Amino acid sequence: MKDKFGLEYTVQGDNEVVNGYASDLLSVVMGRVKPQSVWLTVQTHKNIVAVAKMADISAIIICDGFTADDDTVEAAVRENIPILKTEKGTFEIAGMLYESGIK
């Protein structure tokens, strides 16, 4: 995913991604995301790692040029949740993922 979509790792990882989901509202993500999804968001605080862990999310992509907080990076390393970032918008990345077969 990293090279194919021009993403940059904040926290390394190689978890399998089967699905995709885009939302910035944590409660919605917890209720609707499918396991092994890549989650697109602009949220950067450490609660995204807790949500990812509880929902069995494979990776987080932080969009629109935002950067994960230091506490978030530490939590992601501890929980083995890869975080990537991009300057691209959520809509653009979602479209690219969809076209590649991640739905």
Question: Which ranges hold each PLM region?
Answer:
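Feature captures the catalytic cores and cofactor-binding loops of soluble hydro-lyases/lyases
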Residues: 17-18, 23-38, 43-103
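A diffuse structural propensity rather than consistent per-protein peaks
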Residues: 1-2, 69
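An N-cap/entry alpha-helix motif that binds or orients negatively charged groups
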Residues: 2-20, 30-31
